[in-house]
Amino acid sequence: GPGADQTYFYSSPKRPMTFAVTQLVEGGRDGMVATSRDDVVRIGREDADMNFPEDIFMSGTHAHVQSQGGSFQLVDDGSRNGTYVRVDGSRELKHGDYVFLGKQLLRVEVTA
């Protein structure tokens, strides 16, 4: 309904997320979780969906995970130190895959 001044507020419908990337911390516990926006999760030291500003082994824009035609790709964005499995371009990911970037261990969770 309208607000107190009879103003109606509208917004775009929320798109459902298709996957999440979860940081694993000491002891195997879940840490930070980033859900996909526009079928992409960006990972880096700054201006990313998952930011790790203290990780000197992580590039500013290190890598991203993207959903593409029902598969999931890990794309290295020209990082200086690469990933646990060096990705020169892209690599398909599936639910439960682990990725190591800088000093961060992440798990991909497909929810769609």
Stretch-by-stretch model annotation:
Residues 1-54, 104-107, 111-112:
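Intrinsically disordered, low-complexity acidic Ser/Thr-rich regulatory segments
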Residues 32-103:
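Forkhead-associated
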